[in-house]
Amino acid sequence: MCRISAFFSILLLYFILLTSLTIFRKRVTYKGVFYVFTTFLGIFAGYLCGIFTDIILFSGVSEFNWLFNGINWYSLEVSFSLRLDSLSYLFTLLVLIIGLATNFYVLNYLKYEANEDIFALLINWFMFSMIILVLGNNLFTLFLGWESIGLSSFFLINFWSTRRGTVKSSFKAFFFNKISDVFLFLFLIIVNYITYLNNLNVINIKFFSLFVNFSTMYNFAALCLFLCTLFKSAQLFGHLWLPDSMEAPVPASALIHSATLVSAGIYLLLRFTPLVTLTDIQTAAILIGSLTAAYGGVVSASQTDMKKLLAYSTISHCGFLFVTVGTQFYYASIIYLFLHGLFKASTFFCAGSFIRVAGSQDTRNMGNLSRV
């Protein structure tokens, strides 16, 4: 239990570190920011691996609650609650591994950019937001993390703001994320109305006992949840923002397409598996997921732009993830998501190096890379 408490203390220290470096950015060099973050993230990831036996092998669960009673409206109270279990453990570990690799990659990739320190801070704010999302154990914390990753992704995609295509792409991603946010907000309101609860653990337990009395509300809540994840995880009809987000620097694309933004929707489905089991959302997930997987695979095969090829590949893989959730192979979904995150991040890192050497994103101009 002491080690679990120390984990949350490290997370708090990460927030303090991020806030301090953001405020005093001009007094710290970029390499200073890099060494601070890589050292800290390495310790954080190592410590998380150290409590593997407590979380995975013995299914240990720890909760850290911080209550702020300034706002209390009916059953909805503003409180901050974190929970480390097997699902949030694997997601947090994935974010830390890819985030650590991204920080190393950024050191050389953007060494000639004027605002590389800002980019490093944005990357780490993005990671922190994702960690808050996956550790969140109540409706407020979940929504806070969800909004934070959407806002962070906007600034990451818009990093090269002098490019016209970049600004257009960032606002397009922001627009689709806001649609997802609206459906999530409706979902959370309905869940709170049905259960009069705020804690996610208790809500999932209550779902089974209240289904008979609120079956119609359950189906509407499931529809909102599905539409929310459809736009966030770039499923068919909600995927239009993802290929355009390739205007962002390669490290940002690696994070968006592997461990964070697109996987947030899948995480939400996995966190609310009782609702998925009780409603017809399974059929919708299988149907849309299958169509998305086929569409993404076919379109990616016809792309000559390397980054867009990887973007449509991500769309296809997210479709497969939706199918595994719809068929209730939840453990397969988690394993698939974890491995895909590692694979996709490494693929983007390699693609960034190829683009830098070839001087072009066109795959037709990369035939002589073996000679370099």
What are these regions (language model features)?
Residues 147:
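Short phosphate-coordinating micro-motif centered on Lys-Gly-acidic
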Residues 1-9, 16-121, 198-215, 240, ...:
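Transmembrane helix-loop-helix hairpins at membrane boundaries of multipass inner-membrane proteins
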Residues 101-142, 151-372:
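Hydrophobic transmembrane alpha-helices and their helix-loop junctions in integral membrane proteins
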